[in-house]
Amino acid sequence: MKVNLDRTSSGFCIGVQGTIHLAEEKLREHDGKLYCLGDIVHNEVEVKRLEELGLITIDLNEYSALTNAPVLIRAHGEPPSTYTTAKSNQLDVTDSTCPVVAKLQRSARMLHNRGYQIIIYGKKNHPEVIGINGQCDNQAIIIKHPDLSAPEETAPLDFTRRTALISQTTMDVPGFAMLKENLERLFSASAGPGERHAASHWQDIRDIDLTAEITGVRPLPKFLYKDTICRQVSSRNSKLHDFAAQNDVVIFVAGKKSSNGQVLFNICKASNPRTYFAEDEKDIQDEWLLENRQPVQSAGVCGATSTPMWLLEKVARSIESRFSS
């Protein structure tokens, strides 16, 4: 059996990689004691490794009660209230918010402050979405289903307001496009005769367009969208699809809490039905890698943006050792 490890489209994205490096650095600085608000990464194996080095994962209630202590803000980002608490509690904060997420937060805040109704394509309880919504005074409308199949998600929409569609950085590009088209139809159907054209053709904007509005050079359109999906993440979709197709069996390694992991696993599964989900090498069942009681010719090992490369390598070595004979 040949074991193929995907090193180009799997493993930590830049944002998570930066957070992990900062955590290790701060743990050394603070003699092996550092608090992190929420799981530093949605991978239980990596969290356990860092906790063994001294990282202490805390929830919001524990964070609010903490004083004069070093705290790490993870790559997902946080709402403004988290920083207010840090200041009042004299916390030594290391902010490792992903630059892509930080840019998205600024866009959301600017559009909200200009009076826009903000729609976020994302998952309501995902920490990144909570942070983005916080930039909008927690007034954003969050839609997970691009086909608008959940009426409770669209019920709060005000069809008379200026409206902006943005996205959680790890959502899928086709879903974002579908949501935009469905919102165009929905707003057009609800608009008056004079508004139907604008409502049915939402405009794509760039950062320069936001600056033009703020400086008074030209106004933003009433209905707009800004594709804020991280391309480093989304570009993995097609690459992992191809990788999965090139192997007899695929072992996809990720944490069960990983939103990105679920998306990428489903992409691999669609490309190769013999794709199996594992958190680590202990989850792998021998029968996954057999065909007519013989080892398959090739097994691919890949993972999510929250899966460390050391874990992927460990899984690959485990498969090789189990089927080396």
Swiss-Prot record:
Binding site residues for [4Fe-4S] cluster: C13, C98, C230
Free-text comment on the cofactor: Binds 1 [4Fe-4S] cluster per subunit.
Catalytic machinery residues: E128 (proton donor)
Amino-acid positions noted as binding dimethylallyl diphosphate in the UniProt annotation, renumbered to this chain: H42, H76, H126, S258, S259, N260, S306
Record keywords, A-Z: 4Fe-4S, Iron, Iron-sulfur, Isoprene biosynthesis, Metal-binding, Oxidoreductase
Annotated GO MF terms: 4 iron, 4 sulfur cluster binding; 4-hydroxy-3-methylbut-2-enyl diphosphate reductase activity; metal ion binding
EC number: 1.17.7.4
The protein's annotated pathway: Isoprenoid biosynthesis; dimethylallyl diphosphate biosynthesis; dimethylallyl diphosphate from (2E)-4-hydroxy-3-methylbutenyl diphosphate: step 1/1; Isoprenoid biosynthesis; isopentenyl diphosphate biosynthesis via DXP pathway; isopentenyl diphosphate from 1-deoxy-D-xylulose 5-phosphate: step 6/6
Superkingdom field: Bacteria
Pfam families, A to Z: LYTB
GO biological process terms held by the UniProt record: dimethylallyl diphosphate biosynthetic process; isopentenyl diphosphate biosynthetic process, methylerythritol 4-phosphate pathway; terpenoid biosynthetic process
Function field: Catalyzes the conversion of 1-hydroxy-2-methyl-2-(E)-butenyl 4-diphosphate (HMBPP) into a mixture of isopentenyl diphosphate (IPP) and dimethylallyl diphosphate (DMAPP). Acts in the terminal step of the DOXP/MEP pathway for isoprenoid precursor biosynthesis.
Protein name: 4-hydroxy-3-methylbut-2-enyl diphosphate reductase
Organism from which the protein derives: Prosthecochloris aestuarii (strain DSM 271 / SK 413)
